[in-house]
């Protein structure tokens, strides 16, 4: 029966995905016959809480309280960040649109010495999960025993090395040790599970089992590497995420192992509605008892070279997962990702530079291909702990301390470009994920012939139920540049007729751009025929419904309504087309229209990057500002980096904002439906001396500075060289392998030690025969014609970061 359903599904999708390229760049796709069977009740997953909430899992998506649910997961390792700042960092993740915090429990940190467990300080898992709960964030805990995460031995303790059993096997001696670990974890999070109305909705069992392993740290120069896997798995084990075309002679053994681990986890108290297992590259999962989560790394350090990846090409990801073949039947499970590479670590010889602008197109592609859950690895960087010069880092060329990962939020809590770009898809999924999740992906025939190097054929897909849906497009490819795609028109054939994007004329999809466009959808109960603006969020304020969209450069903002209704516009114009209103505006400008007391706001792309929805349901506002906006109970916390004056706009308009910490000047807004303010504070010049001793050494003295005056202080080194290290109190504090980006170090976590100690920075020159030169952008490569070594350090900066609180007065 299952085989017949699966074959029927493939035939159906083949019939409906009719894409034709005309003589001009026009594209057509037929979704009118879309059909896809969704199975329920076959998975040993799901559960209820003591308050009656429920989570269920079918073959296509997760349901929460009976409604489709689209989780957005961000990885943040509590053990790689100072615990006194966890709360602020979780708030940043929430502001970025994350709904589920994922984290690893690294066994070797918690049981460094056999039989002695440590759950204190930065290893206080319980406190971390409690802070997730306090911020209304769910959590998925990746409990190992093996994790990887570029950790020493992949998280396995050193003392397991050489024991008379195979690690990651069904040997009873090994499983006894794992059972002790699981029981410890279970006790730490007792009462915090979903069933208790707690935040822990999921547990990941093992990691990349029968797919990947880490090198044992106990080794010798010149010796073959030994890996943290059972010997019988060695021939299929990889150093990183990849494709296994060999199959697995021990697949049945692996499934048994995963079943044993799940039972042990449940017996230890880890009873949750969602169990996951990494499913890529033929890894073993718990058959029908776990969701096989997926990955996508476009810039992997474990593979040599700069080859364009397939992770920007649309596909039916539910039937054909990335890194296929897999060990399970994909159609039996929803497609969820755990490790979409929002960043990448580097090694001494391989240094992939990952741009924040690469994150959003990958997510648009992944969601448009049928994924019903996103998971970012890493979303928040950190610093790998050490004990003196005992390093917990995996080593073997990786950073010894820094785990910045080029992530959306970096090693020291600094938000980068990727943070702001991902906010757009995260906000869309938060508000429209329940509508999107049941919609079926339809892939055009033109996609079948696209190779990563083809940057002239439009990359697009549709998710639809045959009538309504969303058009997904992007124009990005890793490692190569993409030209603007001009004079495009995309036709979507639905059961109610053909929808053209746009109806008249054409559009341009600029290089690097990505977009999600709706058709035959209702927003605030107003029927849209189509729109060339992307939905961002929807909310209610004082009983009035608001929907917010943003425009994309290269596309005339156009909203075609389906019915003849009265439209009031501000900053836009309305025309009649085929008897229905069409609202048009200009890209780069804000405009609003109103239908039946429902308000629709269209803002430029740049404003959307810096937009935050704040407040309680029913009483919310949109804030636009280029500072970071966090919610803290009834207050807003603003984090301001390196400036003392900034602007803030609020929609819909409010009476005022209040703060005892800053000067507030009310401004006349450009659009009358906004409130606008200018905020300023007194400049603080940190009493910190940074002295250059020679061409390689800097010494920082912060003994006189009171760190309580600021939220943080960043030292910024704009340098070109091989690498740099930061030493404090005789130990390595952090390090940097040069990738072309400035090196930023936050000082607040070191404030106590800096009261009595200098901080030392040591830089080494780049050589003309360095193995990583091919990874660096041409603009940063030095001229080696006169010297075989090069080191350049521009004037370093000491930059204060402020945090202030404000309160919105709505009445």
Predicted features, each with a name:
Residues 1-25:
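Bacterial Sec-dependent N-terminal signal peptides
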Residues 24-100, 804:
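N-terminal carbohydrate-binding accessory modules
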Residues 41-42, 46-47, 54-56, 64, ...:
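Extended carbohydrate-recognition surfaces in non-catalytic/accessory domains of CAZymes
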Residues 65, 578, 727-733:
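Short strand-turn-strand beta-turns centered on an Asx-Gly dipeptide
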Residues 86-154, 158-159, 262, 266:
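Aromatic-lined substrate-binding rim segments of carbohydrate-active enzymes
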Residues 134-140, 145-311, 323-345, 371:
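Active-site region of glycoside hydrolase catalytic domains
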Residues 163, 174-188, 196-205, 209-211, ...:
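Carbohydrate-binding surfaces of carbohydrate-active enzymes
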Residues 706-728, 761-763:
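Aromatic-lined ligand-binding clefts that engage carbohydrates, nucleic acids, or primary amines
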């Amino acid at each position: 029966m299952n085989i017949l359903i699966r074959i029927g599904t493939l035939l159906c999708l083949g019939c409906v995905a009719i894409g034709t390229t005309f003589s001009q760049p026009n594209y057509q796709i037929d979704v009118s016959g879309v059909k896809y069977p969704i199975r329920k009740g076959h998975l040993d997953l799901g559960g209820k809480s003591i308050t009656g909430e429920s989570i269920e899992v079918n073959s296509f998506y997760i349901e929460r309280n009976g409604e489709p649910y689209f989780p957005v997961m961000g990885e943040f390792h509590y053990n790689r960040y100072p615990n006194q700042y966890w709360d602020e960092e979780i708030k940043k993740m929430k502001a970025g649109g994350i709904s589920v915090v994922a984290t690893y429990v690294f066994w070797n940190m918690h049981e460094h010495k056999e039989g002695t467990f440590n759950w204190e300080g930065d290893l206080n898992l319980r406190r971390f999960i409690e802070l997730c709960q306090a911020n209304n964030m769910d959590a998925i805990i990746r409990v190992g025993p093996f994790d990887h995460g570029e950790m020493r031995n992949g998280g396995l303790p050193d003392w397991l090395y050489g024991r008379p059993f195979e690690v990651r096997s069904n040997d009873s001696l090994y499983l006894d040790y794992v059972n002790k670990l699981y029981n410890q974890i279970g006790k730490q999070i007792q009462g915090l599970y979903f069933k208790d109305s707690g935040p822990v909705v999921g547990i990941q069992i093992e990691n990349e089992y029968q797919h990947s392993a880490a090198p044992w740290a106990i080794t010798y120069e010149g010796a073959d590497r030994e890996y943290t896997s059972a010997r019988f798995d060695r021939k299929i084990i990889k150093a990183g995420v990849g494709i296994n075309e060999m199959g697995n002679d021990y697949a049945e053994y692996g499934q048994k192992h995963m079943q044993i681990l799940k039972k042990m986890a449940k017996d230890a108290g880890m009873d949750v509605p969602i169990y996951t297992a990494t499913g890529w590259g033929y890894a073993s999962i718990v058959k029908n008892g776990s969701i096989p989560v997926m990955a996508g790394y476009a810039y992997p350090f474990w593979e040599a070279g700069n080859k364009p990846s397939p992770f920007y090409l649309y596909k039916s990801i539910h039937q054909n997962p990335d890194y296929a073949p897999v060990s399970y039947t994909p159609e039996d499970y929803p497609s969820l990702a755990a490790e979409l590479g929002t960043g990448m670590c580097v090694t001494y010889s391989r240094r992939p530079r990952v741009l924040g602008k690469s994150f959003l197109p990958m997510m648009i592609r992944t969601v448009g291909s049928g994924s019903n859950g996103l998971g970012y690895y890493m979303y928040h960087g950190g610093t790998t702990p050490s004990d003196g010069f005992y390093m917990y880092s995996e080593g073997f060329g990786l950073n010894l301390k820094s785990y910045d990962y080029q992530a959306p939020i970096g090693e020291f809590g600094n938000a980068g470009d990727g943070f702001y770009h991902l906010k757009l898809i995260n906000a869309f999924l938060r508000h429209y994920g329940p509508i999107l999740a049941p919609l079926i992906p339809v892939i055009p025939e033109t996609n079948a012939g696209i190779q990563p190097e083809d940057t002239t054929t439009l990359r697009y897909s549709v998710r639809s139920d045959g009538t309504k849906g969303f058009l997904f497009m992007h124009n990005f490819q890793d490692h190569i540049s993409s030209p603007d795609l001009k004079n495009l028109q995309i036709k979507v054939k639905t059961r109610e007729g053909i929808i053209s994007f746009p109806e008249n004329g054409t559009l341009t999809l600029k290089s690097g751009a990505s977009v999600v466009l709706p058709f035959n959808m209702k927003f605030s109960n107003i029927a849209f025929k189509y729109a060339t603006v992307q939905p961002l969020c929807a909310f209610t304020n004082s009983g009035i419904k608001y929907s917010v969209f943003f425009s994309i450069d290269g596309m005339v903002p156009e909203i075609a309504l389906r019915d003849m209704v009265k439209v009031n516009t501000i900053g836009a114009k309305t025309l009649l087309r085929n008897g229905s209103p069409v609202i048009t505006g200009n890209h780069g400008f804000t405009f609003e229209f109103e239908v039946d007391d429902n308000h629709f706001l269209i803002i430029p792309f740049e404003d959307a990057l810096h937009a935050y929805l704040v407040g309680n349901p029913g009483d919310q506002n949109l804030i636009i500002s280029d500072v970071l906006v966090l919610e803290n109970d009834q207050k807003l916390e603003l984090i301001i980096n390196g400036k003392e004056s900034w602007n803030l706009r609020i929609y819909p308009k409010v009476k005022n904002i209040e703060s005892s910490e800053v000067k507030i000047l009310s401004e006349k807004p450009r659009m009358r439906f906004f409130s606008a303010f200018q905020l300023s504070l007194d400049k603080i010049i940190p009493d910190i001396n940074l002295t250059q001793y020679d061409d390689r050494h800097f010494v920082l003295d912060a003994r006189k500075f009171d760190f309580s005056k600021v939220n943080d202080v960043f030292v910024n080194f704009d340098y070109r060289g091989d690498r740099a290290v930061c030493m404090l109190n005789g130990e390595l504090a952090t390090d940097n392998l040069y990738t072309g980006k400035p090196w930023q170090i936050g000082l607040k976590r070191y404030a106590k030690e800096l009261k009595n100690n200098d901080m030392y920075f040591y830089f080494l020159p780049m050589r003309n025969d360095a193995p990583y030169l091919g990874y660096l952008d041409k603009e940063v490569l030095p001229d080696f014609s006169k010297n075989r070594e090069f080191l350049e350090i521009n004037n370093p900066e000491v930059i204060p970061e402020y945090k202030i609180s404000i309160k919105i007065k709505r009445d």
